[in-house]
Amino acid sequence: MRSVLSLALLAANVVTAAVVAPFDYSGYKVIRVPTQKDNVKEVQRIITDLNLDTWKYPKSEGQNADIVVPPSQISSFMERISGMNIEMMHEDLGLSIRNETSFEAYSAGYAPDINWFKSYHSYQDHLSYLQDLQGLFRTRSEYVDAGKSHEGRTIPALHIWGSGGKNSKPAIIFHGTIHAREWITTMVTEYMAWSFLSQYNKNADITSIVDNFDIWIFPIVNPDGFAFTQTSNRLWRKNRQPNPNARCPGRDLNRNYPYQWVGPGSSSNPCSDTYRGAQPGDGTEIKVHIANMKKIAANKGIAMFVDWHSYGQLFMSPYGYSCTARPPTDARHQELSRIFAQALKAVHGTPYKTGPICNTIYQVNGDSVDYALEVLKVKLSLTAELRDTGARGFVLPADQIIPSGEETLAGTVAMLKAVIQG
């Protein structure tokens, strides 16, 4: 393998995307301001007055504000927050991104092993890796082109089964990278796919899980946005679908599902990172994913859906749209969340908080978890925010990929064992 810069790794697919010059974050800082009752309104005003981007916006006291500050605003920002406690997440965001995006180029046909998880990778290399991984286990897996993104990219999936054969068991569905900048989710979902395949008939717990469930893993739910983060803007979140009569492209795919679509947990502003779209379910990729989930459900049903995100170290249950409503299966969701968090922590000591989405992180409208539970009638619908809690945020160093994969696999195995046991 040879080291190359991500900007040289342009996708080989021919797509109808406009060329956008790479955004340079050199000199930008990411600063955390913990909020309290006496400063949360002022922090909100500072963000608005200086027109600053945030990784985490403080909607109420006690929440952290993770703020991206450009070089031109650093002096004004530091003056405004004088006297407040702060934590420096990235002294130079551009340098952090350059360190993170020194990819290891992947040679197609390579026998996948743990070395894949020592680096982040280009979109095209992910496609090659997934096909090579499946090629090692042809009798109990398939690589699936699940559909096309708005710009024509493949939405890849791995379908894994055990002794009962293909489509013979209730399904488990894992989604990663619905938000383009959350690269660790791509790698962790692939780590689980690699483990389910390579450890079958070697690890008793994994063998039992694969024999009891039909497993579908979609590591890159939002391929256009993901590719855009690698060539143009590392911190892009949405898809790349144009919005009529608006200068800002993209919708937040996790605000676009057609259930409880309108509310304070999403935005009607096309320039917002949480823009819900013009109509419920109008995202190209959402149409693909809904069609796939319905097709999977038509076999033996869906036992569990998990949407993997970053960052925050959280494992959460429905609902996102309401902070007071609870599903009838709330107790079971909470029990499994605790099992996941306890088993995960036992690996590297990483603490996770658990609870309903709205109460644990923030209110969300039009999200995948609520849609899967209430519309598709998935039995168990959950979501995670992977490492970290904000020391590095979305730009997580590559040396955290393997430990993130190890602990997430342990939590997932423990949780699925509990599902099997009933």
UniProtKB/Swiss-Prot annotation:
It is found in: Secreted. Zn(2+) binds at residues 179, 182, 309. Keywords: Carboxypeptidase, Disulfide bond, Hydrolase, Metal-binding, Metalloprotease, Protease, Secreted, Signal, Virulence, Zinc, Zymogen. One of its GO terms (molecular function) is metallocarboxypeptidase activity. It comes from the Eukaryota. Residues 18-112 form a propeptide. InterPro entries: M14A-like_propep, M14A_act_pep, Peptidase_M14. Its cofactor is Zn(2+). One of its GO terms (biological process) is proteolysis. CDD domains: M14_CP_A-B_like. Extracellular metalloprotease that contributes to pathogenicity. This is Probable metallocarboxypeptidase A. It comes from Arthroderma benhamiae (strain ATCC MYA-4681 / CBS 112371) (Trichophyton mentagrophytes).
